[in-house]
Swiss-Prot record:
Name of the protein this chain belongs to: Required for respiratory growth protein 7, mitochondrial
Principal location: mitochondrion
InterPro entries: RRG7
The entry's keywords: Mitochondrion
Cell location: Mitochondrion
């Protein structure tokens, strides 16, 4: 982990992009068309995935989102592109000083994304998302090991892909200390998103289901250092 970067659970309070309204319409349409199966596991899982897509777009600016949702999805529920160079207020100032050309994280050395942006060599990050609509259990290390395996099955374990891909795990619950430890042991950029379960009100409208906390593992923190993601979504550090 770069000097001065300390892992912290972050609470989000930032603004939402206007285009989130389009996803709200998709969610409402999905609920309306599936009113007969509101209690089914499949319905709730799909509803949560759609909710996560909305938050990815509205809060983080992830685009080209695609719900895989097949029986053979390889453990990846959503894919997308994250062009941080194109998000207002995120890309570094061209005159910003002390942007290293490489940093060490564990046994690996990588080029920070902000350096690539300044060099003109950055391309949108590939985003691979796994959704876990858990209702009770906190998120432990096992799920991150499974995510690591899903990344390998997706055919992206080479160094080139690793440094241009961000893995995200989304769940309504908090991380355990074991979950945090395992996350930081894995030399892959991993972000944990705590996104609440959407709630269907008596009138059929949707409530809740918002991005509440955001956590980068050590590798992701090194890759994204200085990209001002915290500024984008309005983050406040919470003790782990």
């Amino acid at each position: 982990m770069p000097t001065g970067l300390q892992p912290a659970m972050l609470k989000t309070t930032g603004t939402r992009l206007a285009a989130a309204g389009a996803y709200d319409l998709v969610l409402q349409d999905y609920v309306r068309k599936n009113a007969a199966i509101l209690d089914s596991t499949v319905f709730r899982g799909t509803l949560y995935e759609l909710t996560v897509m909305r938050e990815l777009h509205a809060r983080l600016g992830v685009s080209r989102l695609r719900q895989r949702g097949a029986a053979y999805d390889g453990g990846i529920d959503i894919t997308g592109k994250w062009d941080l160079a194109d998000v207002p207020g995120v890309a570094p100032d061209p005159h910003e000083a002390a942007i290293p050309r490489s940093v060490r994280c564990g046994a690996s050395r990588l080029k920070p994304l902000r350096r690539k942006i300044l060099d003109g060599t950055a391309r949108p990050l590939d985003v691979l998302v796994q959704c876990k609509a858990l209702t009770t259990a906190r998120v432990g290390g096992r799920l991150f090991r499974e995510l690591f395996g899903a990344f390998g099955a997706f055919g992206a374990r080479s160094k080139v892909h690793r440094n241009n891909t961000v893995l995200m795990l989304s769940s309504p619950n908090l991380l355990t200390r074991n979950g945090i430890a395992v996350m930081n042991q894995l030399e892959l950029p991993i972000i944990y998103l705590r996104i609440g379960l959407p709630r269907i009100a008596a009138d059929g409208s949707l409530r809740d289901g918002y991005l509440e906390h955001y956590y980068e593992n050590a590798y992701a923190a090194a890759l994204l250092d200085g990209c001002r993601v915290q500024r984008l979504i309005g983050l406040h550090a919470l003790p782990l």
